[in-house]
Amino acid sequence: MAWNSKSGSLNSSSISDDEYWSLFNFVFSESCHKTSTYKFALLKSILDNLLNNTPDENGQLIFYSDLFAKFAESFWNLVVKYHLHQQKPTGEGKTSKIEQIFNEATAKNPLLENLEFASIEENTKSKLIQKVQAECRKYVLGALYGDFGGKLYGFDQNGNFITLSQSAYEFLLKYKIELEKLNYYAWAKFLEKINEENVLFHLLSKLELSLPERTPLEIYRNILFSEFEECNCFYCGKNSAQKSMLTILFPGVL
């Protein structure tokens, strides 16, 4: 099974845009096996690091330290602020590793609950990222690798980076905005499926939203988009908070 693979060779042949779209549509669909939201977060981390890579003769390298720093940051507010579960419930009531790591950290230091991830003291943040990298990379790298048949990246658990193929890198740059929106939508659908209704009421309270006409899916989409897009624009560096406000007012934009 790909999910427990220790390494995966990169398919560096030229892949057409149509083939990549077919692969991404599969990954975003319910036909693609998912037990947690990790695949969505990993895709987001890859997209966030497209301009933070090292060219190599085999493609573009993204180091695990950068990849899982974004991975951890993506989950911080979803887990700590909104208390959203990130995997399907088990009979034993176990939560995902990312939830366990963050909940353990906030139990030891409750002050962390009120901080954005970027505001956490550097030593504490570094330790959190190291734990997330050690625990969460075990299966998600192999799982997503397998979904793409090695046509997106190659990896080695004993190494310290993934290698994007040149075809994949160019495709991701070209369609970054579209892929982000599709990723948010699929992520929101998964969150809606694995979180109970009482969590939704908690979210409405947290967001100070009294919008009975909104569907749960729209609310989860708004959370993801507002959390992840109230930041600097990928291309121009300008703050895009206005854009996220638009998506709350007009959910059809996302």
State where each predicted segment sits.
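Mixed-charge, low-complexity interaction segments
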Residues: 2-229, 239
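Histidine-centered nuclease catalytic patch
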Residues: 237-254
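C-type cytochrome heme c attachment motif
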Residues: 231-235
